[in-house]
Amino acid sequence: MKNINWNDVQEATERRDLPVGGYVAGICKATDEPAKERLNIEWEVAEGEFKGYWREQTASLIERGKLNPGEWAWGGKTIKSYKEKALPFFKGFITAVEQSNPGYKFNNDEKTLRGKLVGVVLREEEYMGNDGNIKTKLVVDRFTSVDKIRSGDYEVRPKKTLAGASGSGYSQSGNDDFSVIEDDGSLPFD
C-alpha cells in the first residue's frame, strides 16, 4: 500500500439523504431556453432540517471531481416547459410562486424568479441506469405554495415506476442538459 498521510485526510461523515416530502425552496436561478420553450429552474431547500442540502451536495461533488465549479447538483434542478400543451402545468408553477411571495406578479421575465420562495413536493421515480439496472431518484413532483408545505397540506404520491417493472406505462426521457451557474457562495433567498 502506498504511504498516505492520514492527518491530511478528512474522515467521511454520515450522509444525509433528502427524503421524499414537501420543502420550502428558494429559486437560485431560472434560465430560458427559447428554442425548447422551457425554463431550467435551479433551486435549494430554504428552510428546515435540510436547508442548504443541494449546496452541500454540489460542494461534495465538486470536491470529488464529479462536478465542475459553478455547476449545480442535478437533484436541485427541474425543467418547466411552456409549450402549448404544458401551459397548465407552467401556470401551476407560476401560481405557486406568486402565492408564496406576497406582492410578486410574474411578468414573463424568468430572471425575476431568482430569490423567490416556492413549495416543492418530491417523490421517488425509477429510471434505467447506464449499467442496465433499475435505480431510484428524487424528482420534483409538483410545486405548491409555501403555506401548504409549512402546514403539511400536501400529498406525496407513490413512487413512479418504469413500464414493465409494475405496469405503470411510464417511459423516461433524458433532460440532463443544464446551464452552468456562477456561485459566489450565497443563495439569493438567504
Predicted feature residues:
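Short beta-rich binding modules
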Residues: 1-190
